Amino acid sequence: MSLSAGLPVRPLLLLLLLLWSVAPQALPPRSHSLRYLFMGASEPDLGLPLFEARGYVDDQLFVSYNHESRRAEPRAPWILEQTSSQLWLHLSQSLKGWDYMFIVDFWTIMGNYNHSKVTKLGVVSESHILQVVLGCEVHEDNSTSGFWRYGYDGQDHLEFCPKTLNWSAAEPGAWATKVEWDEHKIRAKQNRDYLEKDCPEQLKRLLELGRGVLGQQVPTLVKVTRHWASTGTSLRCQALDFFPQNITMRWLKDNQPLDAKDVNPEKVLPNGDETYQGWLTLAVAPGDETRFTCQVEHPGLDQPLTASWEPLQSQAMIIGIISGVTVCAIFLVGILFLILRKRKASGGTMGGYVLTDCE
């Protein structure tokens, strides 16, 4: 999936950043993560950057960097006072190094795909996109895990395996790059050292700096709604306005968990105000809706929260509205009837004045 000069490239960049920053990162409760997202285009003149980086702690943006400025910019209030610290200096140097390596890796991958970066006379070249996500997680038991993945033109491409110091090819086109990079043992060891040592240490330091902000938790609200379509009836469980992102949603039938294969995967998306929303859908037989319950677990909740579709409450609300409107209508008709009757009995007078027709 390549990108041509005629496409609206900036919205696509934002979309790809959103998908890479949210979709793959479902974390278990009480774990913490440090992630860096890199993205660049082979034809930056088309509106995409040659290299752009963003750093996230527990899904909160705290630093950004681009090839043009070659400067790390603080993006969170709790990091502003650290821009002269050794931590920030080390981070800035790392981003500059990743900037250089990203471009070298980009040309390597393009060359192995035979995607020339030289534009022929009179031919509009295509712009290709490289994405990288790398970082680490520190779990509740203090164990750590790291990840380093490449994507090319919107598709999974390569993934680094710290235990074997090798790369795993996600598609046949990545095999040539895998073989070449597997020979670079010094770089592989540097990658492993970063994922297993430097990254967790940096994450713990950032968590200390952001204490009181990063630890904030916003519990979710849960509701279940019913929907009809030509394909049948479904229930939708919605978890609203929660933070952090990690959440577990499941369906229960008669208070027993359903098999995962019978349920559509949960979806979690950002609201734009540093909170998230998630939903989980389930196809049900008509009449069985009340047998199902949605159960939600989140770090902001003291215990799992459950919600069910409540048809009686919905029907009662509708009946109440109709009844209220009917009573109001009868009341207004009664008042109008009394006014007309009084007017007729008074012979057309009101308050001592005689009502006459206008001439």
Curated annotation (Swiss-Prot):
Cross-referenced Gene3D superfamilies: Immunoglobulins, MHC class I-like antigen recognition-like
Cystine residue pairs: 136-199, 237-294
GO cellular component, one term: early endosome
Glycosylation sites: 114, 142, 166, 246
Gene: Hfe
Protein's name in the database: Hereditary hemochromatosis protein homolog
Organismal lineage: Eukaryota, Metazoa, Chordata, Craniata, Vertebrata
Location of region: Alpha-2: 127-217
GO biological process, any: negative regulation of antigen processing and presentation of endogenous peptide antigen via MHC class I
Subcellular location: Cell membrane
Region (Alpha-1): 25-126
Cytoplasmic topology ranges: 340-359
